[in-house]
């Protein structure tokens, strides 16, 4: 099991393949991605690499973390993330990870934070159909309707789909195919859409569930 990398979502575009079909692509940029530290089975109970990305001013780093970066002999990083690895896949501290860590045609899993939508109603949040547009319905056209039963059980069960905060959730999209890798521009072109807003950070790692399809 290899380490993943931290990348930045740039935006979306599209290309046409040999069959004339349009393929949607999401562009992610890999820049200043370095190994900050190791987590070992003997000391921590598991094997992992600590990956950091994007340089940060030393004045904005806490004293304990300054020592961590000083020991690694690298500049402070804005984002840090651990990636579990197998024992044979350790990489030297301060080593850089580039876009060629992945190859075109490979399948990857993307973990990112979805765009926040604020307080949303049941139709937007859970795709409810709403109530009738006419025939006696007044004011409550977009209402979710009844939320419970009667005196027994006399309560609304936990987990009931209702209006509430939507978005800002950590989600993982599995088995996205890498269309191309541009080493010169430090870009990875991934087929399909990826959660998150432009310039947001996400993690890219090898797909856990291997699939074999022709796209």
Curated annotation (Swiss-Prot):
Segments of this protein annotated with the region Disordered: 136-155
Annotated Gene3D superfamilies: 3.30.160.810, Translation factors (2.40.30.10)
Keyword Disulfide bond: no
Listed name of the protein: Large ribosomal subunit protein uL3
Quaternary structure and interacting proteins, as annotated: Part of the 50S ribosomal subunit. Forms a cluster with proteins L14 and L19.
Single Gene Ontology BP annotation: translation
GO CC aspect terms: ribonucleoprotein complex; ribosome
Source organism of this protein record: Rickettsia conorii (strain ATCC VR-613 / Malish 7)
Post-translational modification: Methylated by PrmB.
SS bond partners: none
Encoding gene (name): rplC
Molecular function in Gene Ontology: rRNA binding; structural constituent of ribosome
Family: Belongs to the universal ribosomal protein uL3 family.
Pfam families referenced in this protein's UniProt entry, alphabetically: Ribosomal_L3 (PF00297)
Keyword rRNA-binding listed: yes
Keyword field: Methylation, Ribonucleoprotein, Ribosomal protein, RNA-binding, rRNA-binding
UniProt feature coiled coil, ranges: none
Modified residues annotated as N5-methylglutamine in this record: 151
Chain's role: One of the primary rRNA binding proteins, it binds directly near the 3'-end of the 23S rRNA, where it nucleates assembly of the 50S subunit.
